[in-house]
From Swiss-Prot:
Name of the protein in question: Ketol-acid reductoisomerase (NADP(+))
Ranges of residues in domain KARI C-terminal knotted: 183-328
Active site, UniProt feature: H108
Positions contributing to substrate binding: S252
Biological source species: Leuconostoc mesenteroides subsp. mesenteroides (strain ATCC 8293 / DSM 20343 / BCRC 11652 / CCM 1803 / JCM 6124 / NCDO 523 / NBRC 100496 / NCIMB 8023 / NCTC 12954 / NRRL B-1118 / 37Y)
Family: Belongs to the ketol-acid reductoisomerase family.
Keywords: Amino-acid biosynthesis, Branched-chain amino acid biosynthesis, Magnesium, Metal-binding, NADP, Oxidoreductase
Length: 347
């Protein structure tokens, strides 16, 4: 089935004009969306708790309130707190102050799909999901571009939620790149699967396994890092620009033959079955239950895994290699202050 792509020229922003937008959260997506919307001429306020994000939003010139106060003023409320915090923020601050006929938005459908947030039937519920991290979203917008977004509708009592969602997506710059329709279930399932099986989980395991294979065979960790990790961006850029065809065209014949011959030895039927198992856990809610149980237990397993990865040879080698390339830090100029502080030591 062909999915229609919407661009700036296709979208009327009138449904969003004269509406006050409250963005709840000022992390990567909240920061990017709030700033992009304001630069597009929309009326944006922030709903935040006291802390670094509150101070950062104030410094950036926003009117900042508690989530409850911002919700009470707003026509559109965009939930941009982390997935694991949204249900509590919703229950304590947003739901009691949300007016009938308001528009409740999400950038990820986790809490709706798994039943953690259940808005009343008189609330319009929509999703606007940018397909990229917040700092890239902001950078592209400032430089005159945008990143694609998905939009969808879960509840539509006023009958115009899709138009409001598309106008919002245009406001954050996605109409410059393309806006596609989705559903909450589709976005949530595909997003979680992509992160876990390919983009983050699959890719990091592949990179580290390749790195360790070379090091265990006696090769230099620094050179192993270059071959299995540093060059990854260049290959992905080629795929991003023109698919596998461009990547293969720009690589040598030796590379192309070896890739086609030996790639299937790495991604085997067993690997594919693992992907199907991951997908099933996402679809039936198993992963969501595990993640919420982990969060509610204090993130003990996650913190343990974080510590193990940070102290590993791959990460330590990466720090040495990245120190040779100080220009990499230029990518951080559109990150939030909290992001920059958190990751500066990892350069």
């Amino acid at each position: 089935m062909t999915t229609k792509m919407f661009y700036d020229k296709d979208i009327d922003t009138t449904p969003l004009e004269n509406k006050k937008i409250a963005v709840i959260g000022y992390g990567a997506q909240g920061h990017a969306q709030a700033n992009n919307l304001r630069d597009s001429g929309f009326d944006v306020i922030m709903g935040l708790r006291p802390g670094k994000s509150f101070d950062s939003a104030k410094k950036d010139g926003f009117e900042v309130y508690s989530a409850a106060e911002a919700t009470a003023q707003a026509d559109v409320v965009m939930m941009e707190t982390p997935d694991e915090l949204q249900a509590a923020v919703w229950e304590k601050e947003v739901e009691p102050n949300l007016k009938a006929g308001s528009y409740l938005g999400f950038s990820h459908g986790f809490n709706i799909v798994y039943g953690l947030i259940k808005p009343n039937a008189d609330i319009n519920v929509m999703i606007i999901a940018p397909k990229g991290p917040g700092n890239i979203e902001r950078r592209q917008f400032v430089e005159g571009g945008g990143i694609p977004s998905l939009y969808g509708v879960h509840q539509d009592p006023t009958g115009d939620t899709a138009e409001v969602a598309k106008a919002y997506a245009k406001g954050i710059g996605s109409g410059r790149a393309g806006i596609l329709e989705t559903t909450f279930e589709e976005e949530t399932t595909e997003d979680l699967f992509g992160e876990q099986a390919v983009l983050c989980g699959g890719l990091t395991q592949l990179i580290e396994a390749g790195f360790n294979t070379l090091v265990e065979a006696g090769y230099s960790p620094e050179l192993a890092y270059f071959e299995t990790s540093h060059e990854m961006k260049m290959i992905v850029d080629l795929i991003f620009e023109g698919g596998f065809e461009k990547m293969r065209h720009d690589c040598s014949n030796t590379c192309e033959y070896g890739e086609m011959l030996n790639g299937p030895r790495i991604i085997t039927e067993e690997s594919k079955q693992g992907m199907r198992d991951v997908l099933k856990d996402i679809q039936d809610g198993t992963y969501a239950k595990k993640w919420l149980a982990e969060y509610n237990s204090g993130l003990k397993d996650l913190e343990k895994m974080r510590t193990e990865y940070k102290s590993g040879l791959y990460e330590q080698t990466g720090k040495k290699v990245r120190a040779m390339m100080p220009w990499i830090s230029d990518a951080d100029k559109y990150s939030t202050a909290a992001d920059t502080e958190q990751f500066s030591a990892a350069k």
